[in-house]
């Protein structure tokens, strides 16, 4: 008996977990992305909506561009790249695991901000993966929690990704006297009235969700302000008016969406080098 098609991506991932599937789920849409599974666990997610592990490591300066390129040349299989980085003492195993796992959760959150169009399965593609990976149910639950928290603190999370915060004139020192945490200062220094939260996340190599929370905190401290225009619920936004879908579950897809056409895969870890300076 053939099982009925999954109604959305979370349901699909649960089924693939039961099957112990190793491969890639390509999700179409904006931003869309590729979900890399190993034995049914989510090892990595690559999406234009959130910084990758590569971006996080390089933009932060944790690993230099030159060292990264040399590591990619020495170990071209991205699945084994993490082990190579640890073996060469370029990063600790625990630290790498934290970075990889955090990137999985952040990418799932970023993909959930807009309704996906459909999905298709493909063979395993090399990726810098978290070991052993994240349980799909845990990923869905955490994404739902993040969406709910942002909705309560600010409003529709999808709207927040498109606003362009600006610093408040005469707001005082930017933490030079120690009253503002370093991570908040970094976010504040990246606010210029042109960058969206996503732009800031890529500029800093930090998770989109964390940046959005920090921006809300900055607004509460009257250090930033949103565009004068507002959304229907009173929140400011420069975003074009587009229908908002129910995004309380991770990476949702319509029940009867047609499968998208195949498109080339995402960038390899080495291809992310040089992208870290974009965003404003």
Question: Locations of the language-model features?
Answer:
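Acidic, Ser/Thr/Pro-enriched low-complexity segments and adjacent helix/loop capping patches
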Residues: 1-280
């Amino acid at each position: 008996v053939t099982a009925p098609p999954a109604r959305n991506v979370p349901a699909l991932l649960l089924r693939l977990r039961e099957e112990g599937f190793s491969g890639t789920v390509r999700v179409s849409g904006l931003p869309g992305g590729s979900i890399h599974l190993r034995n049914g666990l989510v090892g990595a997610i690559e999406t234009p909506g959130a910084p990758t592990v590569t971006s996080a490591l390089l933009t932060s300066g944790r690993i230099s561009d030159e060292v990264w390129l040399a590591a990619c040349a020495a170990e071209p299989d991205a699945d084994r790249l993490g082990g190579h980085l640890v073996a060469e003492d370029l990063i600790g195993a625990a630290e790498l695991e934290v970075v990889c796992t955090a990137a999985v959760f952040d990418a799932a959150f970023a993909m959930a901000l807009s309704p996906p169009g459909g999905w298709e399965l493909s063979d395993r593609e090399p990726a810098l993966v978290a070991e052993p990976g994240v349980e799909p149910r845990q990923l869905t639950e955490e994404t739902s929690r993040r969406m709910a928290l942002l909705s309560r603190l600010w409003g529709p999370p999808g709207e927040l990704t498109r606003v362009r915060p600006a610093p408040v004139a005469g707001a005082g020192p930017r933490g030079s006297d120690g009253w503002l945490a370093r991570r908040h200062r970094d976010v504040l220094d990246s606010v210029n009235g042109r960058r969206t939260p996503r732009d800031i996340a890529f500029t800093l190599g930090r998770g989109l969700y964390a940046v959005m929370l920090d921006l809300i905190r900055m607004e509460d401290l009257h250090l930033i302000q949103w565009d004068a225009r507002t959304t229907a619920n009173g929140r400011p936004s420069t975003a074009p008016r587009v229908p908002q879908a129910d995004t309380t579950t991770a990476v949702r897809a319509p029940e009867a969406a047609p499968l998208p056409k195949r498109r080339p895969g995402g960038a390899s870890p080495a291809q992310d080098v040089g992208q870290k300076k974009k965003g404003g």
